[in-house]
Amino acid sequence: MEDGPVFYGFKNIFITMFATFFFFKLLIKVFLALLTHFYIVKGNRKEAARIAEEIYGGISDCWADRSPLHEAAAQGRLLALKTLIAQGVNVNLVTINRVSSLHEACLGGHVACAKALLENGAHVNGVTVHGATPLFNACCSGSAACVNVLLEFGAKAQFEVHLASPIHEAVKRGHRECMEILLANNVNIDHEVPQLGTPLYVACTYQRVDCVKKLLELGASVDHGQWLDTPLHAAARQSNVEVIHLLTDYGANLKRRNAQGKSALDLAAPKSSVEQALLLCEGPPALSQLCRLCVRKCLGRACHQAIHKLHLPEPLERFLLYQ
């Protein structure tokens, strides 16, 4: 009976009904999305928000298309942006990825637009679905002016581990000024992020010599990198001898081994300038170097300021400060 024509007839009817229902539901979704786009283009944001709420389940300020305010902020068109705000456009409208106009302004380095948005109530610590804040975007673009404005309006300089780290992004792209501003606002100089490591480790990985030098001057831990991998391991994989010299001058441990049991020398390319530099550093350091490292270790992370208070002869002070 189960294999008879009646059974197969009912089975085909059931499959047809299920497929029809599925495609009808899909058609409704597409229709609502197109209708949302139509209202956004025509400027009817209130109706667009209502439709978006139906599609995305309660997120009333969220849709896939960027608003005119997003475009004005991204392009740095201050007059257009102020006009839209004066017309009552919500400064905290976000896209489906939770990108706000403030995110766009900071990514473009448009400080005037960013300030106008903040003065009109833009969320200074808004987070996208990828964990990026306006401050992260400002560090990405290298806009020190945007970084300062955001901090003035209460931006958090350091977030939880799972969010994108502004200081790591600044270091990665070699934006030293942004990095220094963040450090001046109490960001942990040795903040380790999974998959990235510490700011010094990132600077060595991307061979940002200026950032490496400044981080070491300000007291970054020379051997703190990414878990067992030290900044010297990261530098050894690259080709910049200057970074190797900076790290060893600040007392990097050449004998430290990573999770694979390898030292920095093991990671250097054979017969390369990096390998030669590491081999030259394997001998015992000079007594003056040992004394300098000992003094700086005793003074701690604040040694850069503390050395000036010791009232030492200028040549000795400059030596302790690596000048």
Curated annotation (Swiss-Prot):
InterPro entries for the chain: Ankyrin-SOCS_box_domain (IPR051573), Ankyrin_rpt (IPR002110), Ankyrin_rpt-contain_sf (IPR036770), ASB9/11_SOCS (IPR037333), SOCS_box (IPR001496), SOCS_box-like_dom_sf (IPR036036)
Protein name: Ankyrin repeat and SOCS box protein 11
ANK repeats: 64-93, 97-126, 130-159, 162-191, 195-224, 227-256
Subcellular compartments: Endoplasmic reticulum
Assembly: Substrate-recognition component of the ECS(ASB11) complex, composed of ASB11, CUL5, ELOB, ELOC and RNF7/RBX2.
Pathway linked to the protein: Protein modification; protein ubiquitination
Gene this chain is encoded by: ASB11
GO terms under biological process: endoplasmic reticulum unfolded protein response; positive regulation of protein catabolic process; proteasome-mediated ubiquitin-dependent protein catabolic process; protein K11-linked ubiquitination; protein ubiquitination
Organism expressing this protein natively: Pongo abelii (Sumatran orangutan)
Family of this protein: Belongs to the ankyrin SOCS box (ASB) family.
GO cellular component terms, A-Z: Cul5-RING ubiquitin ligase complex; endoplasmic reticulum
Function: Substrate-recognition component of a cullin-5-RING E3 ubiquitin-protein ligase complex (ECS complex, also named CRL5 complex), which mediates the ubiquitination and subsequent proteasomal degradation of target proteins, such as BIK, DIRAS2 and RPN1. The ECS(ASB11) complex acts as a regulator of the endoplasmic reticulum unfolded protein response by mediating ubiquitination and degradation of BIK.
